[in-house]
Amino acid sequence: MTATVVAAAATATMVSSSSGLAAARLLSRTFLLQQNGIRHGSYTASRKHIYIDKNTKIICQGFTGKQGTFHSQQALEYGTKLVGGTTPGKGGQKHLGLPVFNTVKEAKEKTGATASVIYVPPPFAAAAINEAIDAEIPLVVCITEGIPQQDMVRVKHRLTRQGTTRLIGPNCPGVINPGECKIGIMPGHIHKKGRIGIVSRSGTLTYEAVHQTTQVGLGQSLCIGIGGDPFNGTDFIDCLEVFLNDPATEGIILIGEIGGHAEENAAAFLKEHNSGPKAKPVVSFIAGITAPPGRRMGHAGAIIAGGKGGAKEKISALQSAGVVVSMSPAQLGTTIYKEFEKRKML
């Protein structure tokens, strides 16, 4: 390990007790530093697994529990190709007419699963994610809220050093390709197959954007809830790359909130990769414009700390990248519709 990496890691350790967000920034930078001449950027190779469709085969970790049972039933009714699930000690049984396995590795071998959704209590959720990584499941969606940040630091450290498994979440609603595949807790009936890619840190605001784009007749191509925790597996840039490369996605809605610097990074990415006459229209809303500094607002990552992470700075960065920022979540649908109208895309 180089001296640079050691110094960065030591600094992150000192800061972690006083500021989780500062630690997150330092750790994320550390992960991108060179170690022994090798840049650990292979995790970006797993972005392709974010896209799901009718052929995606899913297993559920925590299958026989209350949450796992309810949401698995909802997924099956939606038409999702759920092929089984895991609950340690209950292997060999049937649940919802599907096989139960003791381990993720066995479930993958027997079902050919390409994705896993996790409904496991917070103290055990990180272990469930690690088990899915061990089994080389291409896509892991963790719904669980309240996972200890120290657990997720370790998970993130491991994720960034491999390129086989992509994690969405934790503390997120999941991902849905309307009419084809639903992985998570979102209400399926408000979605409609269409043209808008939606990515959000907030679950309920995702549903608001979905409902509005359905109402104005644009629908959705893919909707991704990345979660509001400071240590998550997928960020805005990961999703934006998927949307920009997806021919079915003609416009994008990005919903951010105070805390961290994910929105500023997304703005820089859009400025570089989504400009010129063929740029896709992007509309955004940033929650928390009136939030007081130093107070956490709902999500663990939604906090203005050290004078950074405020809504105004995020809005300014997005606008400088050509993003149309709506001042109200109630206007997301009409705003993206007007952008389509302006560009003669209707």
UniProtKB/Swiss-Prot annotation:
GO terms for molecular function: nucleotide binding; succinate-CoA ligase (ADP-forming) activity; succinate-CoA ligase (GDP-forming) activity. Pathway: Carbohydrate metabolism; tricarboxylic acid cycle; succinate from succinyl-CoA (ligase route): step 1/1. It is an enzyme of class 6 (ligase). CoA binds at T64, G65, K66, Q67, K90, I143, T144, E145. It catalyses: succinate + ATP + CoA = succinyl-CoA + ADP + phosphate; GTP + succinate + CoA = succinyl-CoA + GDP + phosphate. Transmembrane segments: none annotated. The modification N6-succinyllysine is found at K57, K66, K338. Its EC number is 6.2.1.4, 6.2.1.5. Substrate binds at Y207. The active site is at H299 (tele-phosphohistidine intermediate). GO terms for cellular component: mitochondrial inner membrane; mitochondrion; succinate-CoA ligase complex (GDP-forming). The modification N6-acetyllysine is found at K54, K57, K66, K81, K94, K105. It is found in: Mitochondrion. Keywords: Acetylation, Ligase, Mitochondrion, Nucleotide-binding, Transit peptide, Tricarboxylic acid cycle. Residues 1-34 form a transit peptide. HAMAP family: Succ_CoA_alpha (MF_01988). NCBIfam families: PRK05678.1, sucCoAalpha. Belongs to the succinate/malate CoA ligase alpha subunit family. Succinyl-CoA synthetase functions in the citric acid cycle (TCA), coupling the hydrolysis of succinyl-CoA to the synthesis of either ATP or GTP and thus represents the only step of substrate-level phosphorylation in the TCA. The alpha subunit of the enzyme binds the substrates coenzyme A and phosphate, while succinate binding and specificity for either ATP or GTP is provided by different beta subunits. This is Succinate--CoA ligase [ADP/GDP-forming] subunit alpha, mitochondrial. It comes from Mus musculus (Mouse).
